């Protein structure tokens, strides 16, 4: 399902723990890391898609997490031209994402990335809240920054909320 502007509806998932750290997952067979995410199927709400993706990619259920927030708006990123499949109809030029902030409510030992026949991830770790903004693939960086900025007031202790971009003074 691709919208009229060429963007595929998708959900992004930020899972936090009680220390303000976030769940950071290693892409299967690669050296890149990202938050769990996935497409919204026809007839599915963003929340339903989030729970489905959470189970498929991380092995957690609705009972293992609590929704703390969802993004107010769809956040978009364009794919680099080299990743666009120009021969597909309609052409998908990027993703528009509804983001969810979840708190892990169960023991982290319940994380199971091998539930699906084609796992998305083969490793994970807890990282500091702003770490993903500088580590994710460059074309997703602005969306990550915007989602984390929106969720910071909920996810982080007050003194750690501010994110400073490199090269800016103040």
Swiss-Prot record:
Q: Name one Pfam family in it.
A: NUDIX
**Domain Nudix hydrolase positions:** 6-149
Main role?
Accelerates the degradation of transcripts by removing pyrophosphate from the 5'-end of triphosphorylated RNA, leading to a more labile monophosphorylated state that can stimulate subsequent ribonuclease cleavage.
**What is the similarity comment for this entry?**
Belongs to the Nudix hydrolase family. RppH subfamily.
Motif Nudix box: chain residues: 38-59
Q: What class of enzyme is it?
A: hydrolase
Q: Give one GO biological process term.
A: mRNA catabolic process
Sorted alphabetically, which InterPro entries does this protein's record hold?
Answer: Nudix_hydrolase, NUDIX_hydrolase-like_dom_sf, NUDIX_hydrolase_CS, NUDIX_hydrolase_dom, RppH
**What GO molecular functions are on record for this protein?**
mRNA 5'-diphosphatase activity
The uppermost taxa in this organism's lineage are:
Bacteria, Pseudomonadati, Pseudomonadota, Gammaproteobacteria, Vibrionales
The residue ranges crossing the membrane are: none
| Protein's recorded name | RNA pyrophosphohydrolase
Q: What is its EC number?
A: 3.6.1.-
Recorded hits in Gene3D superfamilies, A to Z, give: Nucleoside Triphosphate Pyrophosphohydrolase
What cofactor does this protein call for? a divalent metal cation
């Amino acid at each position: 399902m691709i919208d009229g502007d060429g963007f595929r509806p998708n959900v992004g998932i930020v899972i936090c723990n009680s220390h303000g750290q976030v769940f950071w997952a290693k892409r299967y067979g690669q050296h890149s890391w990202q938050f769990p995410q996935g497409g919204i199927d026809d007839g599915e709400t963003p929340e339903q898609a989030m729970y489905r993706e959470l189970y498929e990619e991380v092995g957690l259920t609705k009972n293992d997490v609590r929704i703390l927030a969802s993004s107010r708006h769809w956040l978009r990123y364009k794919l680099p031209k080299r990743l666009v499949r120009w021969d597909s109809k309609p052409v998908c030029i990027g993703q528009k994402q509804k983001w969810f902030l979840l708190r892990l409510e169960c023991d982290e030992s319940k994380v199971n990335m091998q539930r699906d026949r084609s796992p998305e991830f083969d490793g994970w770790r807890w990282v500091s809240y702003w770490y993903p903004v500088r580590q994710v693939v460059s074309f997703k960086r602005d969306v990550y920054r915007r989602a984390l900025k929106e969720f910071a007031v909920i996810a982080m202790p007050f003194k750690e909320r501010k994110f400073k971009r490199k090269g800016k003074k103040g």
